[in-house]
Amino acid sequence: MLVAANLRPAVVSVAPLVDEIMADLGFGSALAGMLTALPVLFFGLSAPFAPKLAARFGIERTVFGALIVLIAGMGLRFVPDVACLFVGSAVIGAAIGVCNVVLPALVKRDFAHRSGLMTGLYSMTLSGGAAVAAGLTVPIDQRLGGDWQVTLVSWGLLAVLALFVWIPQLSTTHRVVASGPSGSLLRNPIAWAITVFMGSQSLVFYTFSAWLPQYLLDDGRSAAQAGVILATGQAMALVAGLVIPIVAGRWADQRLVTLAVISLCAAGFVGLLSTDHLTTLWVMLVMFGPGASISLALLFMVLRSPSTAVTGQVSGMAQSIGYVVAAVGPILIGGLHDLSGSWSFAMGALGLALIPQGVAALWAARDVKMVL
């Protein structure tokens, strides 16, 4: 779980500082969106290699190596060079992308009989790391005198801790069957439904998390207030990520629960765009959606797969394609804001991602296992 706690802070911590980074480096919204999108893009680009790495070195050593790469990527952000900032973000994304794929396979292997609970705990830890990063990044930055580079690198201390705690796991090596998605998997409608579901919820989560602080700053709030609201939303995602998969796991068919989650997220977007009041509530509802949905996506991978090997393959497929699609979000929404001058238009466009997510849920949440 300490490893899972490291899979979001390096990404989420950029958003509360994006205004400071833009001012310091002279970025526009589109380029800043590219900076926030780069790790998500490399989540997807590195995902197909994760099953092969786990087959070659074992899950335990693969995670250990990914943590080393994560720490190296965060260190690159300290180098006073714009190129290193972007390269470091890409390296961070590649490391996290590998862990994103192999950890659900670990849940399938070791906790198949408690998949709902363990998926919820895993997702809660992901969201918890994001919430802590969202809430503490600005106070850390202020304590460090407004040095955003040092602030970003400081989150590497958590990764160093996880690295040392993981060392005892290296005494055992569990290899999984190699390969990425097979041809039959690529033709399987359930696998594609999980992929679309994963991509849609990731698009909403990372794009909303990336631009919410700037949206709030432009609305007249301070950086500290924006950080608190984002952290509150992330905390709601944490609760949703823990509770919803446990509830959904009680039924063989998860369609009703999943559509209810998507509806709450849609209500949050409507409220945020239609009134200036109750902003924190609307943010909480929006973040409830992807917070629960990432848990549901991981649960679908476990429940719909006939074996640990297939879980790893589905995870690799869903995350490689899904995260590449999601990476477009921060850039697209930043560009739409620059073109229209309106956050309402840009955020409204983001809310449309809930439509394909809802359609995909009708297939992914059914009580049917993949037949390959």
Where are the language model's segments positioned?
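Residue-level signature of mid-helix packing/kink "hotspots" within the transmembrane helices
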Residues: 12, 40-48, 131, 234-242, ...
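Extracytoplasmic gate region of multi-pass secondary transporters
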Residues: 15, 189-241
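Conserved MFS/SLC helix-loop-helix module at the cytosolic interface between two early adjacent transmembrane helices
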Residues: 45-83
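Helix-to-loop junctions at the C-terminal end of transmembrane segments
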Residues: 46-58, 240-253
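Helix-loop-helix hairpin linking two adjacent transmembrane segments in secondary transporters
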Residues: 82, 113-114, 120-171
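Cytoplasmic helix-loop-helix junction between adjacent transmembrane helices
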Residues: 89-124
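C-terminal transmembrane helical hairpin of 12-TM major facilitator-type secondary transporters
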Residues: 254-297
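A late C-terminal transmembrane helix in Major Facilitator Superfamily
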Residues: 308-343, 350
